[in-house]
Amino acid sequence: MTFNDRIAELRDRVRQQRPLIHHITNFVVMNDTANVTLHIGGLPVMAHDREEVAEMVAAAGALVLNVGTLSPDWIEAMIIAGKRANELGIPIVLDPVGAGATSLRTSSNRRLLETLQVAVIRGNSGEIGALAGMGGVVKGVEAVVEADDPLAAAQVLARQYHTVVAVTGRRDLVTDGSRVLAVDNGHEWLKTLTGTGCSATTVIAAFTAVERDYLFAAAAGLACFGLAAELAAPQARGPASFKVAFYDAIYHLAADQIRAGARVVDLSTEQSKAVAQS
């Protein structure tokens, strides 16, 4: 079975199992991430009240923590839900939106990482660099200066917190601190829509809900997400029509499209090779 066969099988497994993805996420992207969860094959729930999060996460396949619209109450809810998820072996995917932009965002994300065992961190180069202490400037929630060495920053962060780190950008990099996979799928029009990084995070969460190799799950999720964008772009005339076509492409993404179009490169070997061709 090739790497792309495995990605296609994992995508089908999400559709078959329909895992519940519990989001504690930001107001800006709630509707979009709920729809993307549905389109990829999962079931979304947005629940952030401290009185219910422990009960809600117990029914979930994965937990998404996204600090985009940050508040102290939500951080406490994230910790309550995250501790319960850890007790039950439910994977947590952290989206450290705006880490490095303010001291509150940076410290809140570090608190989550120090308190909880996170399965995957998905962020842009600026956010990952800021959390790793290796450069990166974030203005608002966008990286305006990348980390000095995004891969090195991701590896440092992965080793420090015993997690998988996915740095998204022109080329996505996914590492557990030693193994490294690069994902070359995507399209520049993703940058014209707010919240696409958050949507990528929820796809990763859906994949981790049914696959315990979190490095593979994160890379597979990003490959499917980026491939859907590539398939949508020729049908679009601008950002609005691209968004509609993108949702359709995620929903209809088929195994044969994944086998033909996913582009994942294994950077862990001495001579980097396209694992899809192995």
Swiss-Prot record:
Binding site for ATP: R122, T168
Required cofactor(s): Mg(2+)
Record-level Gene Ontology MF annotations: ATP binding; hydroxyethylthiazole kinase activity; magnesium ion binding
Pathway entry: Cofactor biosynthesis; thiamine diphosphate biosynthesis; 4-methyl-5-(2-phosphoethyl)-thiazole from 5-(2-hydroxyethyl)-4-methylthiazole: step 1/1
Keyword Transferase: yes
UniProt keywords, alphabetically: ATP-binding, Kinase, Magnesium, Metal-binding, Nucleotide-binding, Thiamine biosynthesis, Transferase
Reactions listed under catalytic activity: 5-(2-hydroxyethyl)-4-methylthiazole + ATP = 4-methyl-5-(2-phosphooxyethyl)-thiazole + ADP + H(+)
Pfam families: HK
EC nos: 2.7.1.50
GO BP: any one term: thiamine diphosphate biosynthetic process
SUPFAM superfamilies according to UniProt: Ribokinase-like
UniProt binding sites for substrate: M46, G195
Task performed by this protein: Catalyzes the phosphorylation of the hydroxyl group of 4-methyl-5-beta-hydroxyethylthiazole (THZ).
Family: Belongs to the Thz kinase family.
Protein name (database record): Hydroxyethylthiazole kinase
Naturally occurring in which organism (per UniProt): Chloroflexus aggregans (strain MD-66 / DSM 9485)
Name of the coding gene: thiM
